[in-house]
Amino acid sequence: MNETESQWDKLLKIKTTGRDDSHADQYRYPYEPTPYSVLERLAERYGERKGLWGIEVINEPVTENMWETMKVPERYPAVDPELAEGSGSVTFDFLRGFYKDAYDRIRKYMPEEKYVVIHDGFELKAWKGYMQEEKYKNVVLDTHQYLMVAEANGCEQTMEGYLKYIREHFQKDIQEM
């Protein structure tokens, strides 16, 4: 098991511990799929389909900065504190390795004209220049610019304040990328 695979447990735990969209694991599968095997199976099953635009590796991973900015444990108290124990953010080193490994596994089954989508973990500029090597074809960086992040960063909660924040931060960052 490599470091990326062992750290996946940490990432998976965040998504299933009641932070934002918890659920009870009512169904036990005969095996525990890894995220890589799930991505491979998705790419194998749907990768050649005409209507498929692409596959996103993971939606909204919570990086260290976002974990602190959003005060995740306070904002989203765990439904099951025992299960949530030890959950936390993921590092950029982990995400960078995970995305490259996932890309390779998806590309085994999905042609290059389809897109592999990676999420910025709410830190758009941290990905500047990432996966730009010739090997990586049709990689799309997904970014979600939420005003609640602006609020957490001290944006005045008025129309004027939001518009100013959008111009000075979101618009500027997107243009730079």
Give the residues covered by each predicted segment:
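Active-site mouth of glycoside hydrolases
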Residues: 1-113, 120-126
